[in-house]
Amino acid sequence: MEFGKRYKAKDYDVIVVGAGHAGCEAALASARMGNETLLITINLEMVAFMPCNPSIGGPAKGIVVREIDAMGGEMGRNIDKTYVQMRMLNTGKGPAVRALRAQADKRQYSIEMKHTIEQTPHLTLRQGIVDDLIIEDGEVKGVVTNTGACYGAKSVVLTTGTAARGKIIIGELMYSSGPNNTQPALELSKNLAKLGFELKRFKTGTPPRVDGNTIDYDKTEEQPGDVEPNHFSYESKDEDYLKVKDQLSCWLTYTNEYTHKIIQDNLDRAPMFTGVIEGVGPRYCPSIEDKIVRFSDKPRHQLFLEPEGRNTDEYYVQGLSTSLPEEVQQEMVRSIDGLEHAEMMRPGYAIEYDVVSPYQLRPTLETKLIKGLYTAGQTNGTSGYEEAAGQGFIAGVNAGRRAKGLEEITLKRSDAYIGVMIDDLVTKGTNEPYRLLTSRAEYRLILRHDNADLRLTELGHEIGLISDERYAAFEEKKAQIEAEKQRLSKIRIKPNAEVNAFVEAHGDRELKDGVLATEFLRRPYVTYQDLLKFIPAPAEPLDRRVIEQIEIQFKYEGYIKKEYAKVEKLKRMEAKKIPARIDYSRIEGIATEAQQKLAKIQPETLAQAGRISGVNPADLSILAVYIEQGKIARVDD
């Protein structure tokens, strides 16, 4: 491959490589902190593009978007401006697993994010392909593009996503490509490997898109948006929420035995099973051919037909991800109820790409090998726009703080789902595309959709990404919550006829004695609005989000206190720092497997060491004694 002659270009504080969901958050965070930031990407028409599902949020992921917003990130604001449908999921379950999901106008989402980037001070957007890094004495000093431009920087964030040596596969067809048939980045991976980084090969996939004009909607089940307003951003207003009639519906259908037979008959042409695909695919988002083989007892699989936007007829067939040959895909699509006459506008495909094994990162997302070099998003082995954006935000903040000579930030597992994800990646690594799930969080009752601001907005203000005006509104919300909680704790409800009729209607026993309003509200069937039927209302009406906090904090108080007690115990473990450059082989009594894992991952705290697979409690106890007694054996320089 021919390269341009190298020449000295401009210097920046921070350079972000790749303008996907991770790169956009990283660049905006850095620039908003006052760093001169360059965001360089292969194609300016693909900024924050959605090459896979046209949606944001869902279980765990939706909470990540709220966390990004609570700290001053952009994804929540952007989807609130460009959604075509909004739904709160798991409303019949407890608050720990409720999650917001928005159907996006994918083109408008990209346009809006690009506009935001272009209007942000200190942020320069450029088209280009980064082929190499400038490294001096183990520290990154800039990047080199394929045209030869050498840009200097104090920190660099790599968010190359599936473009890193990307290869698209459709049946027997294979070709080098980034997502959605964009140009791939071929040289950067080679140069990262030369620097000593361990790279892995992962795979993801996408389903066919069909022409909405050729769908028979009468044979599907409509999935409309919510009537009640909800938003990803704490800054969005209820009056701006789209009425249901202005939202676009999704449509539910299913595969059937005929669909499964078509797939079974063509498994000999499926790259998943012929050995063509080398990369490891996502466990929690398998291709349809993988589902048919793994779950052969299931007679059908759920599919959602999702609109890709207001100004396109393309529908995304969620649940039908595939890399089967194009003609097989068309036959498969037409076997499905409602899609008998559907015209495919784009075939599904698999894409292989390079990832940096994430155990090579610190919890700040800086690489251990090269100072000042950060990685985020699918580059680190995750799947999903939200996971990428969460990492991008943290990497951008830390790259920006490093450029200013400030201490970097880390999020603990008890702080945020973003903290859970990063800790999982750097402590355990991943052998497949990592997806955030509520089950990965041991403190999920305190890591809720509704309280992301209470957990993280103070941090966002400290790092300079939450304005004083927004912070004052946040402080006012907190004050209102506490004032109303105090008011309710002093009011007693008397056992009159009206109250007893209400409790008996809900199958409860009548009151014999008076009860505090707070205790009454703790009953599962009592809402705050029910409570106001029996007690005076507050002097000023309360916002629904304040009321939501009051209800949750009272109803789940006992469980929440138990989780916070666990968090305090964890904090004591996190406070026990492990000195750098330990020779674990010289610590007597630690099992060989544990020595090898500890040496490879180099945990920074005793708590992190305890989460490494292969390190058992006995190993941890010995390590703790060595740390406390100062017996640590360091590696000689």
Swiss-Prot record:
Key words, A-Z: Cytoplasm, FAD, Flavoprotein, NAD, tRNA processing
Cofactor(s) the protein requires to work: FAD
GO BP terms in the entry: tRNA methylation; tRNA wobble uridine modification
Single Gene Ontology MF annotation: flavin adenine dinucleotide binding
Record PROSITE patterns: GIDA_1, GIDA_2
Entry-linked InterPro entries: FAD/NAD-bd_sf, GIDA_C_N, MnmG, MnmG-rel, MnmG-rel_CS, MnmG_C, MnmG_C_subdom, MnmG_C_subdom_sf
UniProt: FAD binding residues: 18-23
Binding-site positions, NAD(+): 281-295
Assembly, per entry: Homodimer. Heterotetramer of two MnmE and two MnmG subunits.
Record's protein name: tRNA uridine 5-carboxymethylaminomethyl modification enzyme MnmG
Naturally occurring in which organism (per UniProt): Ligilactobacillus salivarius (strain UCC118) (Lactobacillus salivarius)
